[in-house]
Amino acid sequence: MRELRTRWSALADRVDSATPAHRDRSVDALRAFAILGVVLGHWLVTALTVTDGSLHGASPLAAMPWLAPVSWVFQTLSVFFLVGGHVAAQGHASAKARGVSYGAWVRQRLGRLFRPVAAVLTLWAIVAGGLLLGGAEPETVRTLLKLVWSPLWFLLVFAALTAATPLVARISPLWPLAVVAGADAWRFGFGGPEWIGWVNVAAGWLVPYTLGAAWSRGAFSRRRQSLFLLVGGGVATAALILWGGYPASMVGVPGAAVSNLNPPTLAAVAFGLAQCGLALLVRGPLARVMRRPRTWAKVALLNLSAMTVFLWHQTALMTVTAVGLLFSTDLPGLHTTPGSVGWIFARLLWLPAFAAALTVCWSAFRVHEQPRAARTTRTAVISAAPRVPVPRSARFEEAGRV
């Protein structure tokens, strides 16, 4: 154990020393928290139960609506889009200054997003085919595939906004916010068609993305602006929930008439503004914490494989659920219906098992997140720094800025 700690400390020191002094470590910390929030949120509210011989998804939020505030902690996608807009706007401006073409820049960005996708889609296409050939119920296969593929909507939206960065980087967040408000008013207030809500898939996430782009240009240098986002977004969210008829949960709940997330509603966007305000307020404290080599190394390495963690976390949950069937078909918190507080406590005990399974997936598939050249050499180039070889442990600098 002592040797392991020594080796980890040495690795952390190498990562810390290889990080450029000008790098804003709080950006990486915010991205890491956003990814972990989504992963833990899914693990806490995703249950697989058998009904009428088929596997179905269930959520404790449906049986215990008073748990809705939990979703306020773990629905962190707005922070991810905030960071994404900030990094993309900075990256595009830097690439343009270096004479890099838009095509080369966007290919590099989108490659980092979609390289890991091929592996998860290929594996689950094989698994789904095997299950169907083995006689599994189509509804069971559909439930499993929905859990695996549902994160891909996020990647598609994020990729579209990334590709549009030169066009949207200077748009005021008020414009997409107005689109979201108008779509909701038409849909809920004037009986408009439901499909109009899907306009919010782009407009809703464009709000935090453009906030991030504004951040890259020097906005939010004063705490007052970030505090306004936090307080204003929080008050607006509370008003929309209490008097506007919006659900309190910031994630989808099976059987609910309205989802705040699918597509995003004005309440979800207002809540995202509050999240972004809080994220911008804690930049200073986060930057100070990130000066600790061991803490920074954990954040840096997570950023290096952020997409792998995001894409495979539901596979990890399903793997543990399937392995558990070898021992019992009624393990609390794993196979049982999420209808009581006891289920929540039991599910918490399964989180280390999910994390262990995710670690196995990470070990097997993280290679797909790296550029092909990085797989065959033990050196990498640190972006926005002199192009000299650096230790492999610092490879996060090139791969982490997605």
Task: Please provide the spans of the model-predicted regions.
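Alpha-helical transmembrane segments and their immediate juxtamembrane cytosolic regions
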Residues: 2-402
